[in-house]
């Protein structure tokens, strides 16, 4: 009876509510009310969502947009650092990654060719379940074992949700059942090989799954205030998952070496630094566009310094951010 009631509420209450919300927000964005142009559209031609074909604008160009972005930045990351401080940190990290890439390339000149041609050996593990088991085994030297060891089931995203779902995601368990966990794989755009391995590290072990189960069990044993479970720690949650994702590139490199694939192991190490480099670049652009009001021309100029000069690629990156 509970399942039937849940299905009834989803189909007759939740889904129609989301449809109404979507229609209402789109109406406000594009037309305003009572024949008046919306404040978003007044701030910049087309606002954030532009139906005229022009490129979108950043938050900084909206009324109080910079103030809003500052609060959003704090709420999502938990960091009280200013935008300028974050930019400096990102630039330092960017330089570190560039240096690491140069060192790897000098040690193995063929690496760049292997990476650009995607001419790496077949990854030793093919199935998600195998990868999760391998990650669980390798993380034991770096992280406490959570007992009993949580189980995880890998399921496919249903076809109707494939166009809207991430390549993979961990479904947070109920507070009272941390032993049975589920990770969903989107077969429509799921990564393979090394990329799937590091994605599962981000979502599973030692990522979100391990993070959630271990934290819930520790907090329960310590009898901490249940209100803690209502608080959002976005920077901590995603920061942890990204940290262990980078660590999993090292796990993958060791796995590849053990499988007799030293060149592929070096490619995995190179991928780790290029991934970090990419995230640094995207974060810098986010701060420039939404924090300082940079437009497409300024962003294209910055991307040009990174060796990205294709107008189509620059426009795609700008629009995405």
Regions found by a protein language model. Name each.
Residues 1-321:
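N-terminal maturation segment of proteins
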């Amino acid at each position: 009876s509970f399942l039937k009631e849940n299905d009834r509420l989803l189909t007759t209450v939740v889904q129609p509510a989301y449809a109404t919300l979507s229609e209402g927000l789109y109406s406000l964005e594009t037309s305003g009310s009572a024949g008046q142009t919306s404040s978003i559209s007044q701030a910049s031609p087309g606002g954030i969502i532009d139906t005229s074909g022009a490129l979108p604008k950043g938050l900084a160009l909206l009324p109080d947009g910079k103030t809003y972005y500052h609060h959003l930045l704090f709420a999502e990351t938990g960091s009280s650092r200013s935008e300028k401080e974050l930019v400096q940190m990102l630039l330092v990290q960017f330089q570190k990654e560039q240096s690491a890439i140069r060192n790897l390339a000098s040690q193995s000149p063929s690496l760049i060719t292997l990476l650009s041609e995607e001419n790496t050996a077949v990854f030793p593990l093919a199935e998600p379940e195998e990868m999760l088991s391998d990650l669980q085994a390798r993380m034991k030297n770096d992280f406490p074992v959570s007992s009993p060891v949580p189980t995880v089931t890998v399921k496919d995203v249903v076809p109707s949700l494939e166009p809207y779902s991430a390549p993979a995601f961990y479904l947070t368990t109920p507070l009272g059942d941390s032993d049975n966990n589920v990770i969903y794989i989107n077969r429509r755009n799921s990564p393979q090989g090394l990329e799937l391995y590091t994605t599962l590290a981000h979502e599973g072990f030692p990522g979100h799954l391990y993070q959630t189960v271990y934290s819930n069990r520790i907090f329960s044993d310590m009898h901490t205030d249940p209100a803690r479970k209502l608080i959002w720690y976005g920077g901590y949650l995603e920061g942890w998952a990204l940290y262990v994702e980078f660590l999993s590139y090292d796990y993958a490199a060791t796995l590849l070496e053990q499988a007799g694939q030293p060149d592929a192991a070096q490619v995995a190490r190179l991928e780790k630094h290029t991934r970090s480099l990419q995230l640094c670049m995207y974060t810098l652009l986010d701060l420039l566009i939404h924090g300082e009001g940079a437009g497409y021309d300024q962003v294209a100029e910055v991307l040009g310094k990174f060796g990205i000069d294709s107008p189509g690629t620059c426009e795609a990156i700008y629009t995405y951010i």
